[in-house]
Every structure is written in structure tokens, then in C-alpha cells.
Amino acid sequence: MSSPDRLVYMANQIGSFFKSQGPKQAVAGTAEHIKKFWDPRMKAKINEHLDAGGEGLDPDVRAALESLRKV
């Protein structure tokens, strides 16, 4: 399983890919990618990291993760 630092890095990389499409698409695209392609254990671990303050997460990535909690 990936460490929280590795997951933060991966999530931020995904977010940076979508950032050029504008803030709303950055959030939506990042959320959709994580929802579709991340293993449930990875999602649980990044959510634990978010609960602990989410250090290192890009604001758009943080918003994407928060949006997934509302689903």
C-alpha cells in the first residue's frame, strides 16, 4: 500500500494535469479520476490524511477529495 506522502504526490499530479482546464474542471476531473481508478484502500488512506489536516494537498485536490465524501 502507498504511504500518505506518495498518495499526496499522486493526487497532486492528477490535479496538476486537470488544472489547465480551469478550477472547476480541475476539481471535477481529479475527483472523477480518483473515484474511477484508485483502490479503495488508497482512497481510505488519503481520506485519513485529509482528516489529519491534509498537509501538502493542493487546494483543488483537497476540494476534489471533499466532493467525493458528499457522494
PLM features: residue spans?
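N-terminal intrinsically disordered, cationic/polar leader segments
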Residues: 5-8, 28, 59, 70
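Short, charged early-sequence alpha-helical segments and their helix-coil boundaries
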Residues: 42-68
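N-terminal acidic leader/helix
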Residues: 1-23
